[in-house]
Amino acid sequence: MHFVAISINHRTADVTLREQVAFRDDALRLAHEDLYETKAILENVILSTCNRTEVYAIVDQVHTGRYYIQRFLARSFGFEVDDIKDMSEVKVGDDAVEHLLRVTSGLDSIVLGETQILGQMRDAFFLAQNTGTTGTIFNHLFKQAITFAKKAHSETDIADNAVSVSYAAVELAKKVFGKLKSKHAVVIGAGEMGELSLLNLLGSGISNVTIVNRTLSKAKILAEKHNVSYDSLSALPSLLETTDIVISSTSAEDYIITNSMVKTISETRKLDSLVLIDIAVPRDIEPGIDAITNIFNYDVDDLKDLVDANLRERQLAAETIAGQIPEEIDSHNEWVNMLGVVPVIRALREKAMNIQAETMESIDRKLPDLSERERKVISKHTKSIINQMLKDPIKQAKELSTDKKSNEKLELFQNIFDIEAEDPREKAKLEKESRAKEILAHRIFSFE
């Protein structure tokens, strides 16, 4: 059995392509089932977000499994198999495990260390598990990956610092006010940066936000989309008299907020603090305003310094997390190898106990006059002899779980002791067939 991961992400395909290969939420369960029907696929999980579509699978043969996954993606989205090959990357074995761990912990995200992907990966796994397309290996591996990511985020500050300009703007406001929930904010500009600023403000707990834009209809559309208020640019002077935070991101040629405007409203505001954050280039807010008492003015350079410092902190945390991944891979491999070791040990014990039982039957026939106590003593001692004889072989078998050639050595081990253990691969295939029948039955009854 082999672990294969095929990923279409921000490194392998631009956003135009990624938009075309994203599964709708309501189509994911059926997608899991469709892929699982393929004989070469023993287990599968599909992750589909705005930045990546990935298929994780346990396959019987790497080349066959890889092809069927690529064919599945091609058919799902109307591409040729070669197109999927060109826009994706393939990871196998340890590389696939590393990829899963990096993705789940946010090391492979556009925004380094973001936590949303952890929830998305957890949801993808739970959906696959509930659909019936995971088995022994993925049920263990994905729980391991999720636990690893949670630990990575709790033990490092990788997600604690702002690494986008719009998010950093809100962080600067927090430095002045602390909690923002009770504050009023004005966002000037209804473009992409304006909407990102709005989303970060709402995410900080602020509900009282006003969108201001030169074109009122654009402000109205954005405001209604996010359930906030809106106003025209001409209302800005009066809004400045009562607001606490202003984030400006227009493409205006002249200053939107001037020194004279702020001096006028500062007399009305008295000692109330006002945070002005200018993320526009050219600037929307006239320089020098922060010389006025209780007016805090930040421009894009101030934000860049904060973002750069925070990114360095995240990169250091990412290096720490990445350094822990090899140990996780080793732990997974040892666990997988034990799947092959346990049946061998079980078969060895069964053979030994059968020999002991046959020996006791022979003793009973040849010494029929033994008392019950004498029989129990003999039985106890023969079992003790067997356990002592098995101690070292079992220890050696367990140590094979860390051996790269464990399959070959386990086969030799079985030949030496003339035992035949259950093959984990055959067991996985039988389990897959059973789950596939359950899925098919569920489809039939659901259709009816």
Swiss-Prot record:
Assigned keywords, A-Z: NADP, Oxidoreductase, Porphyrin biosynthesis
Any idea of its EC number?
A: 1.2.1.70
Which InterPro entries does its entry note?
4pyrrol_synth_GluRdtase, 4pyrrol_synth_GluRdtase_dimer, 4pyrrol_synth_GluRdtase_N, GluRdtase_CS, GluRdtase_dimer_dom_sf, GluRdtase_N_sf, NAD(P)-bd_dom_sf, Shikm_DH/Glu-tRNA_Rdtase
The UniProt record gives the binding positions of substrate as: T49, C50, N51, R52, S109, E114, T115, Q116, Q120
MF terms in GO: glutamyl-tRNA reductase activity; NADP binding
Which domain of life, per UniProt?
Bacteria
The pathway that the record names for this protein is: Porphyrin-containing compound metabolism; protoporphyrin-IX biosynthesis; 5-aminolevulinate from L-glutamyl-tRNA(Glu): step 1/2
Q: Which reaction does it catalyse?
A: (S)-4-amino-5-oxopentanoate + tRNA(Glu) + NADP(+) = L-glutamyl-tRNA(Glu) + NADPH + H(+)
Q: Name one GO biological process term.
A: protoporphyrinogen IX biosynthetic process
Which residues hold NADP(+)?
G189, A190, G191, E192, M193, G194
Query: A Pfam family in this protein?
Result: GlutR_N
The record's listing under SUPFAM superfamilies reads:
Glutamyl tRNA-reductase catalytic, N-terminal domain, Glutamyl tRNA-reductase dimerization domain, NAD(P)-binding Rossmann-fold domains
Q: Where is this site: Important for activity?
A: H99
Which pairs of positions does the record mark as disulfide bonds? Answer: none
- Any idea which residues are catalytic in this one? C50
- Function (record text): Catalyzes the NADPH-dependent reduction of glutamyl-tRNA(Glu) to glutamate 1-semialdehyde (GSA).
Q: Show the HAMAP family listed in the entry.
A: Glu_tRNA_reductase (MF_00087)
Its UniProt miscellaneous note says: During catalysis, the active site Cys acts as a nucleophile attacking the alpha-carbonyl group of tRNA-bound glutamate with the formation of a thioester intermediate between enzyme and glutamate, and the concomitant release of tRNA(Glu). The thioester intermediate is finally reduced by direct hydride transfer from NADPH, to form the product GSA.
Q: Tell me the domain comment.
A: Possesses an unusual extended V-shaped dimeric structure with each monomer consisting of three distinct domains arranged along a curved 'spinal' alpha-helix. The N-terminal catalytic domain specifically recognizes the glutamate moiety of the substrate. The second domain is the NADPH-binding domain, and the third C-terminal domain is responsible for dimerization.
Quaternary structure annotation from Swiss-Prot or TrEMBL:
Homodimer.
**Similarity remark:** Belongs to the glutamyl-tRNA reductase family.
Protein name (database record) = Glutamyl-tRNA reductase
Question: What organism is the protein native to?
Answer: Staphylococcus epidermidis (strain ATCC 35984 / DSM 28319 / BCRC 17069 / CCUG 31568 / BM 3577 / RP62A)
Q: Which gene encodes it?
A: hemA
